């Protein structure tokens, strides 16, 4: 039902708005559907100024879309949330949410109230998470490093670097293990941001390399400076080191020309005093986000220190965190006096400028507070390097999650098929209206194995039926419970034991994607009224340039 309002806008209510929301969600899911799985296809996105992005990553695709419909925006934000929280599973979370909405709409057409559907979905989600944690998880302790490599390979399988999965999986696992540190509670932590990824196009993917230490895409400020410093004391500055000049508007009236030289000399001395304060604390590596002029460089060269200018703020923050330094935006303290203390310095075993691949880089090795690692990516062109970076980010997040949660689940649609059988049986044990909603939830989960099979050019109906038969047997017959690891083998088009094949995903990816998808679907299902206000018309007395052209006012 649509009708005018006393407010300046339109109103849609009831069935109409619900169907509209479901269609919007389905159209968003259809965009990313074909990119799911190891044989998913890539999307080329061109923005309004002509920048091209070629990607397979669900979160990136949806981030670059200009979406107007409010329900569709919810799904785009959902993918972004999954990317930030877990790092992987962004495509599947959107597909599941859209399928849940589609099936809820079918129930709505059968006159089942949305509140019953919502409570059924909540119940099904809770039960599904419990079933995963009790029956489908594999502890990583019994699998060791191989498990981490397999989880990374599974994450990369659908990406551009999947063809060299073994090479990149080892690189990712080594990088994540290199940045491990223990927090105040004694828990191991793996800050993925400590892995700096640099891209250089040219050469092949296989010439990418992992470097221990933080790699800075900068060079020393002057050729006269040392290229290697052992036992480095690092000063991190967020301001320019340049000759102090009097501010604009300051007028100095002098009668003696020699006084002019004294003023210039004093300007130089102020800068020299600043630099002496920094060097007096023992600092021998100075990193700044601003510029360093020639006069300041001369003082650093004389002191035998290494100075690097135009460091990215992001890099400076990470180096400060790793080395234990304090980033200073000014030397002035609260009293207005300029001071610099030794406690503000960070420490590293070695800072060296090296030629890696085709570029000169500065490496900061064995920092005091935390260790760091860097990956230099090589690829044919910029599009390829960007997509490789996104793929590596997903893989790094997956390995981090496996190490933190210490559990994985089989991939290839195994979890979804097992849950669909379990929830169907669970639904029949319910004697209330929620039974229908739980059964629809179970059916919705099958969209993942279905889509995987369709994208791999296989017969999805046949494959999913076989998969369900295996999982039903596993749940009915305790002697054959090992069949619960059966998932899809998409290259050969048949079911297989994915635990033996090493197709693993972190448990948290599956659990979070189920929870997030259910919550997003419920958020949209609760909407039964849309009031859209019209934009205010601006009364422009003078009119626009186009109006003037049409009226002929410019022809005089």
Swiss-Prot record:
It is found in: Cytoplasm, Cytosol; Cytoplasm, Cytoskeleton, Microtubule organizing center, Centrosome. GO terms for cellular component: centrosome; chaperonin-containing T-complex; microtubule. Pfam families: Cpn60_TCP1 (PF00118). The modification Phosphoserine is found at residues 6, 544, 551. It comes from the Eukaryota. Mg(2+) binds at residue 88. GO terms for molecular function: ATP binding; ATP hydrolysis activity; ATP-dependent protein folding chaperone; unfolded protein binding. Keywords: Acetylation, ATP-binding, Chaperone, Cytoplasm, Cytoskeleton, Hydrolase, Magnesium, Metal-binding, Nucleotide-binding, Phosphoprotein. The modification Phosphotyrosine is found at residue 181. ATP binds at residues 37, 89-91. Its EC number is 3.6.1.-. ADP binds at residues 37, 89-92, 158-159, 412, 505. One of its GO terms (biological process) is positive regulation of telomere maintenance via telomerase. CDD domains: TCP1_alpha. It is an enzyme of class 3 (hydrolase). It catalyses: ATP + H2O = ADP + phosphate + H(+). InterPro entries: Chap_CCT_alpha (IPR012715), Chaperone_TCP-1 (IPR017998), Chaperonin_TCP-1_CS (IPR002194), Cpn60/GroEL/TCP-1 (IPR002423), GroEL-like_apical_dom_sf (IPR027409), GROEL-like_equatorial_sf (IPR027413), TCP-1-like_intermed_sf (IPR027410), TCP-1_chaperonin (IPR053374). Coiled coil: none annotated. The modification N6-acetyllysine is found at residues 199, 400, 494. The modification N-acetylmethionine is found at residue 1. Component of the chaperonin-containing T-complex (TRiC), a molecular chaperone complex that assists the folding of actin, tubulin and other proteins upon ATP hydrolysis. The TRiC complex mediates the folding of WRAP53/TCAB1, thereby regulating telomere maintenance. As part of the TRiC complex may play a role in the assembly of BBSome, a complex involved in ciliogenesis regulating transports vesicles to the cilia. Component of the chaperonin-containing T-complex (TRiC), a hexadecamer composed of two identical back-to-back stacked rings enclosing a protein folding chamber. Each ring is made up of eight different subunits: TCP1/CCT1, CCT2, CCT3, CCT4, CCT5, CCT6A/CCT6, CCT7, CCT8. Interacts with PACRG. Interacts with GBA1. Interacts with DLEC1. Belongs to the TCP-1 chaperonin family. This is T-complex protein 1 subunit alpha. It comes from Macaca fascicularis.
């Amino acid at each position: 039902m649509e009708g005018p309002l006393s407010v300046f806008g339109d109103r849609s209510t009831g069935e109409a708005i619900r169907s509209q929301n479901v269609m919007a969600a389905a159209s968003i899911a259809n965009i990313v559907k074909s990119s799911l799985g190891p044989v998913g296809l890539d999307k080329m996105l061109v923005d309004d100024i002509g920048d091209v992005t070629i990607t397979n990553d669900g979160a990136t695709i949806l981030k670059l879309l200009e979406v107007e419909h409010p329900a569709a925006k919810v799904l785009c934000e959902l993918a972004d949330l999954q990317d930030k929280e877990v790092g992987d599973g962004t495509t599947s979370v959107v597909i599941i949410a859209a399928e849940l909405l589609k099936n809820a709409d079918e129930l709505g057409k059968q006159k089942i109230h949305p509140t019953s559907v919502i409570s059924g979905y909540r119940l099904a989600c809770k039960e599904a998470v419990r079933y995963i944690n009790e029956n489908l998880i594999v502890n990583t302790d019994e699998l060791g490093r191989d498990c981490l490599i397999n989880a990374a390979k599974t994450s990369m399988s659908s990406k551009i670097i999947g063809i060299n999965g073994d090479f990149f999986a080892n690189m990712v696992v080594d990088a994540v293990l290199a940045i491990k540190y223990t927090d105040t509670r004694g828990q191991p932590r793996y800050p993925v941001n400590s892995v700096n990824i640099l891209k250089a196009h040219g050469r092949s993917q296989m010439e990418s390399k992992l470097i221990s230490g933080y790699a800075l895409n900068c060079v020393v400020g002057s050729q006269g400076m040392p290229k290697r410093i052992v036992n480095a004391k690092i000063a991190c500055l967020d301001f320019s080191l340049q000759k102090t000049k009097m501010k604009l508007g300051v007028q100095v009236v002098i009668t003696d020309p020699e006084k002019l030289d004294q003023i210039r000399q004093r300007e130089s001395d102020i800068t020299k005093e600043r630099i002496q304060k920094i060097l007096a604390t023992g600092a021998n590596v100075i990193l700044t986000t601003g510029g360093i002029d020639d006069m300041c460089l001369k003082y650093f060269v004389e002191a035998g220190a290494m100075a690097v200018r135009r460091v990215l703020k992001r890099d400076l923050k990470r180096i400060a965190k790793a080395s234990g330094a304090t980033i200073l935006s000014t030397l002035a303290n609260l009293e207005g006096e300029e001071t610099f203390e030794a406690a503000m310095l960070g420490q590293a075993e070695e800072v060296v400028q090296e030629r890696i691949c085709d570029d000169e880089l500065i490496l900061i090795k064995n920092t005091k507070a935390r260790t760091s690692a860097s990956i230099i990516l090589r690829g044919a062109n910029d599009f390829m390097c960007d997509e490789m970076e996104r793929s590596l980010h997903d893989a790094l997040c997956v390995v981090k999650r496996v190490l933190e949660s210490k559990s994985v689940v089989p991939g290839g649609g195994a979890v979804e098929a097992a849950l669909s059988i379990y929830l169907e049986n669970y639904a029949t044990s319910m004697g209330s209206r929620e039974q229908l909603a739980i059964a629809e939830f179970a059916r919705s989960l099958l969209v993942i194995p279905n889509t995987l099979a369709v994208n791999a050019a296989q017969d999805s109906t046949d494959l999913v039926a076989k998969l369900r038969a295996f999982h039903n047997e596993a749940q009915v017959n305790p002697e054959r419970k090992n069949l619960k690891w059966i998932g899809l083998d998409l290259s050969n088009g048949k079911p297989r034991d994915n635990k033996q094949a090493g197709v693993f995903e972190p448990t948290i990816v599956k659990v979070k994607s189920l929870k997030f998808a259910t919550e997003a679907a419920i958020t949209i299902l609760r909407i039964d009224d849309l009031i859209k206000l019209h934009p205010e018309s601006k009364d422009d007395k003078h009119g626009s340039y186009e109006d003037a052209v049409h009226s002929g006012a410019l022809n005089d």
